[in-house]
């Protein structure tokens, strides 16, 4: 094996951080506040919310991004000098676009496979808006810190915006060095927040993710990471996330979903399910939370329950009045995987076939679904259908790993391992 280079450190670090912070959003819902607020007694969390900010975040966590953006635009207009208001709006715009392009599927981040994925196709105008709002938020934070370097709220929101920029640079620009610098800046800001205000539990969400990620790196990468001052502890990371989740603060939901993802990696499925079910109870219109419950049941080996959960998600999504713009192709593919695990090859083939019928389906997911459907047809001894699926995979992207697998299956029918 070749040794890890510095780019590997950045890629592995960002991969883990994105896994914890990206999937369901990382943002601090707070009331726009004046800089004078920061000089009071050390705060235990972000400032309280106003009615419009609360409304924005209710819509945000329901995945009704359009309404959330409208609310946050009004807040920023009323408080143009507040870095929190800028952070809220850019977060909603960014995650709205990520959701549109199918980048919030947890399956992408359960492993590091997304590192090799092509850039997500962001709309150019949206990208420009995101960059402008991030720069505005950072500038407003810096203005407050210039007046008071120990302004806890300014440090906190600067850390949030730096983290958001790290996600954008990694996913959209694939700029790993720049993403790593911003991720480290976010971590250091929130470490300083806890030093100045030890009861500021919301800062533990970011730090919990970072500590867990660093503790999960290969030892060779840890050695390189230590050169830039990165400590690590998976146990401490998970405990920090539990602390933030149980504190009931502004990042409680974000801490729970990071917990669910990391506990899934630890095979602590019951704990992960408990975290997700709390989120579902609080936000029953959030399609991704419901999908994550089904994913966890599948990964836990609870096949029949997973099948039922995926079917419930699909049925609810097709009603058209519960979830906002659900990417049902994600649930269809998950259903195929769950049915495959139950040796229901005909049912799995049907589920995989339905993936390409969704207008929102990502081309990579369609490719994976076609390959999987072909394998099911081979197991069902329907070779003609299998061959058509393999040919479709190769036609879509002849240089992909799926195409290489499809070529092997064209030479020899797929058989169950």
Identify the function of each model-found stretch.
Residues 35-52, 59-71, 81, 92-150, ...:
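Short coil/linker segments at helix-helix boundaries
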Residues 13-26:
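Bacterial N-terminal signal peptides
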Residues 78-82, 147, 196-197, 248-250, ...:
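Short solvent-exposed coil/turn linkers within tandem alpha-helical repeat scaffolds
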Residues 85, 154, 203, 255, ...:
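TPR alpha-solenoid repeat register
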Residues 75, 144, 193, 243-244, ...:
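Canonical positions in the second alpha-helix
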Residues 54, 88, 95, 157, ...:
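"A position-specific structural signal for the A-helix of alpha-solenoid helical repeats
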Residues 187, 191, 212, 229-233, ...:
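TPR/TPR-like (Sel1-like) alpha-helical repeat modules
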């Amino acid at each position: 094996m070749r040794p890890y280079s510095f780019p590997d450190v950045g890629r592995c670090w960002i991969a883990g951080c994105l896994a914890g912070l990206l999937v369901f959003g990382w943002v601090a819902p707070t009331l726009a506040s004046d800089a004078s607020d920061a000089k009071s007694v050390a705060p235990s969390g972000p400032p309280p919310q106003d009615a419009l900010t609360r409304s924005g975040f209710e819509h945000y966590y329901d995945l009704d991004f359009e309404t959330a953006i409208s609310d946050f635009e009004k807040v920023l207009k009323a408080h143009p000098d507040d870095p929190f208001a800028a952070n809220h709006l850019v977060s909603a715009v960014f995650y709205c676009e990520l959701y549109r392009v199918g980048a919030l599927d947890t399956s992408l981040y359960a492993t590091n496979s997304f590192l090799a994925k092509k850039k997500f196709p962001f709309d150019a105008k949206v990208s420009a808006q995101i960059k402008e709002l991030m720069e505005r938020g950072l500038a407003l934070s810096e203005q407050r810190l210039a007046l008071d370097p120990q302004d806890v709220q300014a440090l906190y929101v600067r850390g949030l915006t730096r983290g958001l920029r790290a996600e954008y640079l990694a996913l959209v620009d694939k700029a790993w060095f720049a993403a790593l610098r911003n991720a480290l800046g976010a971590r250091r800001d929130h470490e300083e927040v806890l030093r100045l205000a030890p009861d500021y539990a919301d800062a533990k969400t970011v730090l919990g993710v970072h500590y867990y990620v660093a503790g999960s790196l290969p030892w060779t990468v840890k050695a390189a990471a230590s050169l830039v001052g990165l400590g690590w502890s998976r146990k401490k990371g998970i405990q920090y996330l539990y602390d933030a989740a149980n504190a009931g603060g502004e990042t409680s939901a974000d801490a729970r979903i990071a917990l669910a993802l990391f506990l899934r990696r630890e095979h602590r499925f019951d704990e992960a399910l408990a975290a997700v079910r709390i989120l579902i109870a609080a936000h029953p219109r959030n399609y991704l939370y419901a999908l994550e419950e089904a994913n966890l049941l599948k990964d836990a080996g609870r096949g029949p329950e997973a099948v039922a959960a995926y079917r419930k998600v699909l049925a609810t999504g097709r009603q058209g009045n519960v979830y906002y713009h659900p990417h049902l192709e994600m649930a269809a593919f998950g259903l195929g995987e769950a049915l495959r695990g139950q040796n229901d090859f005909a049912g799995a083939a049907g589920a995989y076939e339905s993936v390409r019928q969704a207008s929102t389906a990502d081309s990579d997911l369609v490719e994976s679904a076609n390959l999987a459907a072909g394998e099911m047809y081979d197991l069902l001894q329907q070779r003609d259908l299998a061959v058509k699926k393999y040919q479709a995979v190769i036609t879509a992207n002849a240089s992909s790993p799926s195409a290489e697998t499809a070529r092997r299956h064209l030479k020899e029918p797929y058989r169950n391992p």
